[in-house]
Amino acid sequence: DTFLHCCIESRGCQFSRKCGSCIMCDYGEGRNLHPDELRKELDERVSQYMNGLHTILIGTYGSIFDEDEISSACFDVILEFLAQYSIPTVIFETHCSTVNSNKLKKIRDKIPRKTKVIIEMGYESCDAYVLKYCLNKFISLEQLKNAIKLIHDYRMSACTNVLLGAPFLCERDQLDTAVKSVNWAFEQGADSVVVFPMNIKPFTLLYKLY
């Protein structure tokens, strides 16, 4: 199966701008695109890969549903672009706090019903201590549960990302918290879970500590 990850430039994650990024994140910041500019980029750079594609993941430097990164007009451009192609699976990557009925309804109205739509959300761990003190991750687990339910209300699939190898923990605790987090996500109704091994990337706080 062919897979394409399309990362759209943006001003960056709202949490990184306001209170510091997750300890392992190297997404950085860019600039927001004008709708006409985005349309041109999609047509010139992405369309060549669309025919015969099985899965496309649409993301940004932060959250695709965050209108401080991707304006409503730009989001419409993305949906109009995707609607031109018969792609079996479309994935939108976003923070759970940005999941709302307006965005999900737009997707349902634009994307063909036969297309499987997945909303992918990074939550990393169900352990509040790990989130706050090991990762500097700003997320409400209650908000994540509500997002999963809302996604299902619009007949879409919810995917959560779990981190394996949280810093400042011994190996046993790293494994235990990852297993607990996978199980917790499924208990809340997640349709799938992606486990990401910790990647020590340059220009991150984790890299400096390492």
Over which residues does each language-model region extend?
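Canonical Radical SAM [4Fe-4S] cluster-binding loop centered on the CxxxCxxC motif
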Residues: 1-40
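Residues at the starts of beta-strands that form the adenosine-phosphate
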Residues: 21, 55, 89, 157-159
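Extended, folded domain segments that form the structural surfaces/walls around functional sites
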Residues: 22, 97-113, 128-147, 152-154, ...
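Core AdoMet radical
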Residues: 26-41, 45, 49-70, 82-100, ...
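Acidic (Asp/Glu)-rich catalytic clusters
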Residues: 45-51, 78-85, 105-116, 148-155, ...
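Distinct, well-ordered alpha-helical segments
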Residues: 68-76, 100-111, 172
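Surface-exposed, active-site-proximal loop segments in enzymatic domains
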Residues: 129-135, 172-173, 204-210
